[in-house]
Amino acid sequence: YEITPYEPGDCRPVVFFDLAVGDQALGRIEITLHDDVCPKTCENFRCLCTGERGNFVEGSRRTPLWYKGSRFHRVIPDFMAQGGDLEKHNGSGKGVCIYGRSFADEEASLAFDSPGVVAMAATKGQDANGCQFFVSLGEAPWLDGKHVAFGRVSSGLEVLRAIEERGSAHGRTRGVVVVQNCGQLQ
């Protein structure tokens, strides 16, 4: 695989999360998606931010394909903040995406060279991407090539730090960090 550097100012999609703990607003995180590098992964994430694809239907069960109302269920300081479980909201969901239950890995070409790198959390192993993702809270070069890294926090690193402060070494959070609203800016 090839690791490509971040190029500020590129015309890439930008999505956002407005985050809160209880009734306390934490602020907004904006994420620039590298759709030129990982188009399928970025389209899945973008659609899950906008909610434009409706519901995932399996039998009588309907799961909204939207991050609004989802949680950051696992936060480990100096490492990562994980969220996006649309089924169970605690990391144990089977996984859903705009393509069905899961989709294959794309070239993991963004480097985990700073805080704010956004990647898929393929909890079931390789080629098992769904809705769960994580945001790096520091450099993590050992993850290069192991997770599909497709975006970077372009605004709101202070909000990311506020989430990090609610984490623990085991990943449990103090308070429930919720995506109050999300969508696409550009």
Model regions and ranges:
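Cyclophilin-like peptidyl-prolyl cis-trans isomerases
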Residues: 1-186
